Design a protein with these regions (language model features):
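Conserved, structured core segments of small domains
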Residues: 1-101
Length: 101
């Protein structure tokens, strides 16, 4: 499992392709790739999107980058994938499930 924070490129306008992005989500949710995700908003203006936070199931960091690049936001350079913050995550708890010691 991977924790991802990917900010939008400085001049990006995600609203121009958000419908295409959302239309692609069911496939990666249903196959278990996207565990959780959502829009990150600017703290000073909660209506202004600045990126995305995701939990992605993949084997390697390189696989995560491929998933990001295949997303509409990746294809249209909305996300600044080169500067994405990607870390392997050992998930101890998520709603409905807890790690058993």
């Amino acid at each position: 499992l991977w924790s991802v924070v990917v900010y939008d490129s400085p001049e990006a306008d995600r609203m121009t392709v958000v419908d295409k992005h959302v239309a692609g989500l069911p496939a990666i949710i249903e196959d278990g790739t996207l565990v959780a995700g959502g829009q990150i908003n600017d703290n000073s203006d909660p209506r202004k999107p600045i990126g995305s936070s995701l939990m992605i199931r993949a084997d390697t960091k390189e696989d995560v980058v491929k998933i990001l690049k295949n997303d509409t936001f990746g294809k249209y350079n909305i996300w600044d994938i080169d500067n994405a913050i990607i870390h392997n995550l050992f998930c101890v708890y998520r709603e409905g499930q807890a790690y058993q010691l």
